[in-house]
């Protein structure tokens, strides 16, 4: 079997066996193709891949200026592929596994304070259809902590408005049920009754879409559209660097913990597989406590 065939077999294994999302599959494909393009010029025989091969590739990535996080991801994808080949009997040696992956410095998530979130939510002009749509989806991200990718994949049947619940499909297509706050529920009802029908009527291709959020042409609103509009709104209320729609998700978790929510509950709401992913928000709240203390205590 040719190397490209093995790659397709590996990606199929991830998609079917591991339930990996299409976006993650594409990242795996790109990273492994890059490794194959660079290293198979040196080592035409897969069996000859060893720790020197991996070190050479690691050095190449560093020289190209990739960040530690990108290098760690690329090395992880490549190692997973090689482990797959070893399991299939295509390669026997595991010497390549001796090369350590670069350690990633954990960065505290960027979030907005509560007054900043409230200011952001007031920016869209709710008197217009698109403004009310944007106010609704911003409120929904903050009220549920969902990712933008999860938001744009919501369908009409995702909603259980009477129970104020929503079905969300996260990473790996894993389903979770999240509660929806009173304000977000009221906005959703208004959007569904007075805005979505107007947007749907603007569709010219004759198709009927089940997507919850539609663009001005009546088609499903995409990830790029959400991010574009967010940048337009956030620039009016905050000049912090690196603030994105994902910052609303970070704000959701941070504000819950500041309000006394249990860490395990926040983990479930966020859809985190590991509690360690959720624990980073405890560092954020401690930093906030320290900031408030030093600003308010008279003997500082």
What are these regions, as identified by a protein language model?
Residues 1-300:
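Conserved catalytic core of the tyrosine transesterase superfamily
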């Amino acid at each position: 079997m040719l190397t490209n065939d093995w790659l397709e077999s590996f990606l199929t294994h991830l998609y079917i066996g591991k339930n990996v999302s299409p976006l993650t599959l594409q990242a795996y494909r790109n990273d492994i193709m890059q490794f194959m393009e660079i290293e198979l010029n040196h080592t035409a025989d897969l069996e000859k891949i060893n720790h020197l091969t991996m070190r050479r590739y690691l050095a190449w990535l560093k020289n190209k200026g990739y960040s530690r996080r990108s290098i760690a991801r690329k090395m992880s994808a490549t190692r997973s592929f090689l482990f797959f080949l070893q399991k299939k009997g295509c390669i026997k040696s595991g010497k390549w596994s001796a090369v350590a992956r670069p350690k990633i410095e954990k960065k505290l998530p960027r979030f907005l304070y509560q007054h900043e979130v409230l200011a952001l939510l007031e920016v869209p002009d709710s008197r217009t259809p698109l403004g009310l749509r944007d106010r609704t989806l911003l409120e929904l991200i903050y009220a549920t902590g969902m990712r933008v990718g999860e938001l744009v994949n919501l369908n009409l049947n995702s909603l259980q408005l009477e129970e104020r619940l929503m079905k969300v499909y996260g990473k790996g297509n894993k389903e979770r049920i999240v509660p929806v706050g009173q304000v977000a529920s009221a906005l959703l009802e208004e959007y569904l009754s007075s805005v979505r029908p107007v947007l749907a009527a603007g569709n010219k291709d004759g198709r009927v879409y089940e997507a919850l959020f539609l663009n001005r042409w009546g088609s499903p609103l995409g990830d790029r559209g959400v991010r574009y509009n967010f940048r337009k709104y956030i620039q009016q209320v905050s000049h912090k660097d690196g603030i994105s729609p994902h910052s609303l998700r970070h704000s959701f978790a941070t504000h819950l913990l500041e309000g006394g929510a249990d860490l395990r509950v926040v983990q479930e709401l966020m859809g985190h597989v590991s509690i360690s992913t959720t624990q980073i928000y405890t560092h954020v709240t401690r930093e906030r406590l320290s900031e408030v203390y030093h600003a308010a205590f008279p003997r500082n």
